[in-house]
């Protein structure tokens, strides 16, 4: 098999009974899982691409960067808007997802790694729920507005339009062998952000 294997990396044996969602699924659960995935792919001499979806920790991303440098397997990673923009201090029932929000060091590292190109692409992780479901503890948030907010933030921090095009469009398309002619990324996003925020009965990015 020479295609893409995308993995959600959290090792459940490291989960705890903490009342905090972020602390109950600690960073180490992701780091150990990513380590194992890289080792499995390397030992199997995997010829495809191992993709680490919605990476959220500095430790896990460091392992991905080391594997890329070593060059024995092809490995990519993606990051979500919420893991790049919010830390666990913002955690509430509306900002609850898996993997959970991490501490500020992890968040800042994810954001800077998007800027540097060390993360291959942005993933919306779009998983909307009703307000009632969120108040019952369901995991997942709508990702459209967050994607626009992240686009703005990366632009404001000096990312070129060419590199934005890569991480929002072409890198993922190339990895999955999709031949597309992507639409230009929006420059004026404020109206779109308002529309996206109003599509749901609550806006987790405004809470």
Each PLM stretch: what is its role?
Residues 83-84, 95, 111, 152, ...:
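Broad hydrophobic/π-residue packing in well-ordered secondary structure
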Residues 11, 86-87, 103, 160, ...:
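General structural signal for secondary-structure boundaries
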Residues 11, 81, 127-128, 206:
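A broadly conserved detector of short glycine/acidic/proline-rich loop/turn motifs that flank catalytic sites
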Residues 139, 146, 182-207:
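C-terminal cap of metal-dependent C-N hydrolases
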Residues 1, 54-56, 128-130, 165-175, ...:
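Short secondary-structure transition/capping segments
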Residues 1-122:
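Histidine/acidic residue-rich metal-binding segments in metalloenzymes
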Residues 21, 25-47, 113-185:
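His/Asp/Glu-enriched, well-ordered alpha-helical/loop segment
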Residues 72-74, 116-121, 171, 190-192, ...:
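Active-site lining segments that contact anionic ligands and/or coordinate catalytic metals
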């Amino acid at each position: 098999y020479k295609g893409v294997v995308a993995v959600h990396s959290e090792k459940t044996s490291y989960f705890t009974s903490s009342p905090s969602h972020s602390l109950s699924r600690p960073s180490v659960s992701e780091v150990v899982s990513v380590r194992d995935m890289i080792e499995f792919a390397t030992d199997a001499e995997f010829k495809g691409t191992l993709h680490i979806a919605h990476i959220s920790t500095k430790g896990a991303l460091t392992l991905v960067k080391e594997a890329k440098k070593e060059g024995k397997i092809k490995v990519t990673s993606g990051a979500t808007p919420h893991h790049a923009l919010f830390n666990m201090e913002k955690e509430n029932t509306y900002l609850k997802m898996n993997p959970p929000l991490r501490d500020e060091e992890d968040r800042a590292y994810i954001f800077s790694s998007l800027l540097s190109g060390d993360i291959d692409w942005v993933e919306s992780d779009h998983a909307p729920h009703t307000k009632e479901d969120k108040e019952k503890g369901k995991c997942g948030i709508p990702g459209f507005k967050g994607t626009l907010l992240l686009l703005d933030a990366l632009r404001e921090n000096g990312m070129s339009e060419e590199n934005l095009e890569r991480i929002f469009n072409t890198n993922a398309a190339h990895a999955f062998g999709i031949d597309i002619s992507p639409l230009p990324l929006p420059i004026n996003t404020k109206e779109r952000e308002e529309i996206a925020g109003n599509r749901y009965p609550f806006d987790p990015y405004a809470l």
